[in-house]
């Protein structure tokens, strides 16, 4: 599979990423902005989407019945050099399945 994303700077306060027919406003403002995700939040969102898509892929194979699922992520970043030093996540599944089956 191949993927394509195009991102462009709108102004000093934000950028716009597009893929297929979807658009995502990017927080590229040095001061930050509340109405858009910054690069780390986008990375965590992509990781959450991968986990949720994995759940969608596996549940039919295992004949699971789920009513909902959510992923909570948090990251810690150091400043010098700038890098993520920790990513922690929790997956919460709403299902009538037994704990033993959910552990699969």
Task: Give the location of each predicted region.
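Extended beta-strand/beta-hairpin segments
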Residues: 1-45, 53-104
């Amino acid at each position: 599979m191949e993927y394509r994303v195009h991102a462009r700077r709108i102004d000093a306060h934000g950028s716009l990423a597009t893929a297929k027919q979807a658009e995502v406003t990017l927080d590229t403002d040095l001061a930050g902005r509340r109405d858009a995700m910054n690069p780390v939040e986008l990375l965590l969102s992509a990781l959450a989407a991968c986990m949720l898509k994995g759940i969608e892929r596996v549940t039919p194979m295992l004949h699971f019945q789920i009513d909902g699922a959510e992923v909570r992520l948090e990251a810690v970043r150091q400043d010098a050099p700038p890098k993520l030093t920790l990513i922690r996540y929790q997956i919460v599944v709403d299902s009538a399945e037994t704990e033993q089956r959910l552990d699969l």
